[in-house]
Amino acid sequence: MAKKTYDLLFKLLLIGDSGVGKTCVLFRFSDDAFNTTFISTIGIDFKIKTVELQGKKIKLQIWDTAGQERFHTITTSYYRGAMGIMLVYDITNGKSFENISKWLRNIDEHANEDVERMLLGNKCDMDDKRVVPKGKGEQIAREHGIRFFETSAKANINIEKAFLTLAEDILRKTPVKEPNSENVDISSGGGVTGWKSKCC
């Protein structure tokens, strides 16, 4: 059996309208790269990045979902095992911000009750084209008791900070397991979070 190279596995999900920059946010964090020619995600895709927090190696499995309505049933099935969900809107697109309330409802309907949520106002490098004031993002985050960052995948603003903050928030409420605990086997099951036996 291959030696496990991490202590914990956190499944994260990026959701939001098509075109808000979810894939760019993910690639900036996972590969420190930015590409202006991404095509829309078809269905679902994921990346893995291992980070170290509080002396623990944490493998982040980050799922990038399609924002289009026609993929709705595919993507909602991925909400269940998610431990952290980033809701992304585009500060230059008012409709993408209005739809955040719809995405929040999707989380309530499909995700685990204790999932950590975070709101990201992306493309903050395009301030000259801004239509969503920062205060509006802060307000909706306050109303729902979630963290908020304005980010830019292009200019690499707050991307790493957002992911690490979300991971820290999850870590804070993750029960500490004894190192010799025998009931944990993450090596099987293709990387899904089978070890978190909260839901049935």
From Swiss-Prot:
Compartments where found: Cytoplasmic vesicle membrane; Golgi apparatus membrane; Golgi apparatus, trans-Golgi network membrane; Endosome membrane
Cofactor(s) needed for function: Mg(2+)
Sequence positions that bind Mg(2+): T23, T41, D64
E.C. code: 3.6.5.2
UniProt keyword annotation of Hydrolase present: yes
Glycyl lysine isopeptide (Lys-Gly) (interchain with G-Cter in ubiquitin) cross-link, renumbered residues: K102, K136, K154
InterPro entries with a match to the protein in the record: P-loop_NTPase, Small_GTP-bd, Small_GTPase, Small_GTPase_Rab
Effect of T23N: Probable dominant negative mutant locked in the inactive GDP-bound form; alters the basolateral recycling pathway in epithelial cells and endoplasmic reticulum membrane morphology
Entry's Gene Ontology cellular component terms: adherens junction; cilium; cytoplasmic vesicle membrane; cytoskeleton; cytosol; endoplasmic reticulum membrane; endoplasmic reticulum tubular network; endosome
PTM sites of type N6-acetyllysine: K102
Tissue: Expressed in the hippocampus. Expressed in neutrophils (at protein level). Expressed in the testis (at protein level).
Ranges spanned by the short sequence motif Switch 2, renumbered to the chain: 64-81
Alphabetized GO MF terms: cadherin binding involved in cell-cell adhesion; G protein activity; GDP binding; GTP binding; myosin V binding
Positions occupied by motif Switch 1: 32-46
Complex and partners: Interacts with MYO5A; mediates the transport to the plasma membrane of SLC2A4/GLUT4 storage vesicles. Interacts with GDI1 and with GDI2; negatively regulates RAB10 association with membranes and activation. Interacts (GDP-bound form) with LLGL1; the interaction is direct and promotes RAB10 association with membranes and activation through competition with the Rab inhibitor GDI1. Interacts with EXOC4; probably associates with the exocyst.
Family (UniProt): Belongs to the small GTPase superfamily. Rab family.
Protein name according to UniProt: Ras-related protein Rab-10
Naturally occurring in which organism (per UniProt): Homo sapiens
Gene name linked to the record: RAB10
